[in-house]
């Protein structure tokens, strides 16, 4: 079974999940069939937890740690004394095995890569690569970027510019182990570490070298560079694997170690950074105000109030809600790096790091196991999530109203027959009037007495034609209800007086004319052919009348251009106007009468009031006289 240390907080969503906090150690962890989830034991309870919230703890040398004190107790020989002398009085039990542990870790975990292409750093935390350089790989920071050491410098470099070498041979590992023993176990270079390692058999063989180093005092001869290199890489590796279990160094140290160790501690402290996910405006003086994407130096997570962290931003210290930010490492505080070369394409896509801070801002709905695929996408550890989730509820844009579908307008109906208005009531009666015209052509021309001398015999002809065509008109009267007749009614609407109809005098007729008109027009043409004869017979009379009364002749010509239908419409219109004028006059006269009556009534009321006022004055004067008499009588008595 493997143990894991928690790097990010996680709140359990289901009963079979564990609630974990940063720094806790989960025991007896095993992988599950479901990708992205592990199962382990914490505080006596076993459950599931996401694998990207924890980090594996290498426990390869732990079994030997328990045997270490037993060996030292049993030995009781010069070797234990040499260990005490080499550390100048420091307890050797807790310090001595670490160089061996580091050597063993190098043997099992050491990764190296060779530079294939030159690379110039674009940021301060990047390494400069030259073809042929060998880099000690520490960890994979994010997809396409690794962290490693080159020439005593720790930094980032693109993974697609290097090629990973195979693990070093055992001989090389042992040589590295022996080299590390000399500087690290000498009198001036003990280095404590959080983990406990064991002292294997080769360690006891290397002890005489320590004695020689103490005796001659020149243990750093030709090894100063190796000391710095080995110390930097090993300490950085320890920092990566056992970061939460940092212990304070015991005893005095050499100047060289004191210079390097604070640097490592500083790097560890510098990892306490967090990136803001959402903008926040402080409501109190001790709160920070920040925008999205800013980097806050995390000072403390323990502020005495749950859900609040203490940090520093732009030189100001204050508290801020932890669900508005996500913790990142120092190497990621400059993320994103747009100028870096694109990382090579890899199979599994990185998944967003669903930390507890993000979960508080927008809780995950992981009730369904299908949605746990969000956790299955592992982020590049310990980088911040590359795809930040949606922000908390923002004043929205909305939210989002449903767009109503476009109104479907009904099909435009055909234009109906206009209802007969009072002034245009004749339009609806054209068919009836037309039949009346045929039956009563004599009555309408008689309205104008000046028209009779012009056509003295046409009256009899029209009456004759009307009598002959009456039966035909009655038979075809039912055809008027057709659609053609409706259109015909609109086409033959009465025109203005003084305008001649094109169908009457030009010889043409509308194709939509009713059967009555088609029968009537030829007969009228026949009557028109007879009119010249009538004019010749009464030429003298017509000339005299035209000379004597030129105005009447113009009236006759105007009346000749009007059809009986138009004459009737004109007469009715004139009658309507006259009636309306008469009604208005009657109303005005009635109003005047009413006003006069009101004036009379008002005058009568005023007279009554005046009389009453005079009477009241007289009564008052009488009362005053009587009161005066009474006063005199009272005074005299």
Swiss-Prot record:
Expressed in podocytes (at protein level). Residues 1-59, 108-167, 269-330 form the SH3 domain. It comes from the Eukaryota. Residues 1-175 are annotated as: Interaction with ANLN and localization to the midbody. Residues 166-177, 356-379, 437-449, 517-539 have a biased composition (Basic and acidic residues). Residues 166-209, 226-254, 333-455, 488-555 are annotated as: Disordered. Residues 578-636 form a coiled coil. Disruption phenotype: Death at 6 to 7 weeks of age from renal failure. Mice show defects in epithelial foot processes, accompanied by mesangial cell hyperplasia and extracellular matrix deposition. Phosphorylated on tyrosine residues; probably by c-Abl, Fyn and c-Src. A motif (SH3-binding) lies at residues 336-352, 378-397, 410-422. The modification Phosphothreonine is found at residue 563. Keywords: Cell cycle, Cell division, Cell junction, Cell projection, Coiled coil, Cytoplasm, Cytoskeleton, Isopeptide bond, Mitosis, Phosphoprotein, Repeat, SH3 domain, SH3-binding, Ubl conjugation. This is CD2-associated protein. It comes from Mus musculus (Mouse).
């Amino acid at each position: 079974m493997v143990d894991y240390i928690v790097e990010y907080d996680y709140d359990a969503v289901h009963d079979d999940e564990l609630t974990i906090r940063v720094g806790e150690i989960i025991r007896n962890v095993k992988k599950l069939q479901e990708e992205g989830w592990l199962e382990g034991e914490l505080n006596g309870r076993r459950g599931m937890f996401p694998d990207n919230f924890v980090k594996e703890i290498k426990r390869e040398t732990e079994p030997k740690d328990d045997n270490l004190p037993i060996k030292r107790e049993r030995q009781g020989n010069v070797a234990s004394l040499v260990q005490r002398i080499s550390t100048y009085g420091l307890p050797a039990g807790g310090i001595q095995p670490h160089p061996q542990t580091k050597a063993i870790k190098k043997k099992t975990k050491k990764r190296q890569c060779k530079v294939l292409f030159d690379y110039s750093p674009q940021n301060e935390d990047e390494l400069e690569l030259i073809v042929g350089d060998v880099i000690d790989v520490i960890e994979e920071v994010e997809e396409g970027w690794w962290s490693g050491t080159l020439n005593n410098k720790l930094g980032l470099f693109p993974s697609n510019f290097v090629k990973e070498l195979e693990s070093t041979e055992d001989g090389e590992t042992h040589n590295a182990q022996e080299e590390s023993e000399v500087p690290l176990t000498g009198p001036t270079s003990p280095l404590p570490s959080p983990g406990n390692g064991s002292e294997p058999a080769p360690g006891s063989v290397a002890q005489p070298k320590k004695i020689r180093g103490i005796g001659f005092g020149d243990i750093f001869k030709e090894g100063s560079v190796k000391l710095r290199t080995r110390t930097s890489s090993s300490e950085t590796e320890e920092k990566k694997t056992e970061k939460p279990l940092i212990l304070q160094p015991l005893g005095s140290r050499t100047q060289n170690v004191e210079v390097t160790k604070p640097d490592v501690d500083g790097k560890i402290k510098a990892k306490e950074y967090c990136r803001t996910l959402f903008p926040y405006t402080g409501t109190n003086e001790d709160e920070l105000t920040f925008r999205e994407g800013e980097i806050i130096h995390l000072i403390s997570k323990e502020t005495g109030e749950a859900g609040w962290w203490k940090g520093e931003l732009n030189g100001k210290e204050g508290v801020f809600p932890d669900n508005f930010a996500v913790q990142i490492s120092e190497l990621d505080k400059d993320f994103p790096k747009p100028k870096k070369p694109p990382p090579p394409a890899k199979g599994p896509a990185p998944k967003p790091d669903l930390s507890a801070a993000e979960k508080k801002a927008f809780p995950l709905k992981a009730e369904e196991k299908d949605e746990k695929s969000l956790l299955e996408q592992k982020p590049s550890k310990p980088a911040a999530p590359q795809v930040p989730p949606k922000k908390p509820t923002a004043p929205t844009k909305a939210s989002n109203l449903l767009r109503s579908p476009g109104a479907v307008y009904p099909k435009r109906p055909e234009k109906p027959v206009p209802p007969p208005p009072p002034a245009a009531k004749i339009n609806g009666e054209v068919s009836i009037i037309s039949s009346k015209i045929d039956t009563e052509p004599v009555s309408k021309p008689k309205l104008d007495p000046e028209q009779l001398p012009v056509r003295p015999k046409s009256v009899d002809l029209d009456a004759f034609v009307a009598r002959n065509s009456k039966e035909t008109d009655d038979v075809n009267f039912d055809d008027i209800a057709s659609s053609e007749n409706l259109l015909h009614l609109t086409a033959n609407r009465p025109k203005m007086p003084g305008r001649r109809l094109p169908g009457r005098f030009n010889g043409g007729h509308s194709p939509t004319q009713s059967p009555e008109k088609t029968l009537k027009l030829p007969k009228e043409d026949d009557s028109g052919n007879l009119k010249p004869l009538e004019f010749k017979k009464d030429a003298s009379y017509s000339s005299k009348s035209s000379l004597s009364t030129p105005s009447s002749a113009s009236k006759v010509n105007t009346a000749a251009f009007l059809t009986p239908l138009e004459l009737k419409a004109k007469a009715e219109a004139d009658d309507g106007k006259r009636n309306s004028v008469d009604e208005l006059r009657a109303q005005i006269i009635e109003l005047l009468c009413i006003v006069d009556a009101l004036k009379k009534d008002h005058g009568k009321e005023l007279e009554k009031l005046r009389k009453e006022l005079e009477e009241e004055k007289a009564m008052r004067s009488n009362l005053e006289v009587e009161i005066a008499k009474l006063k005199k009588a009272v005074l005299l008595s």
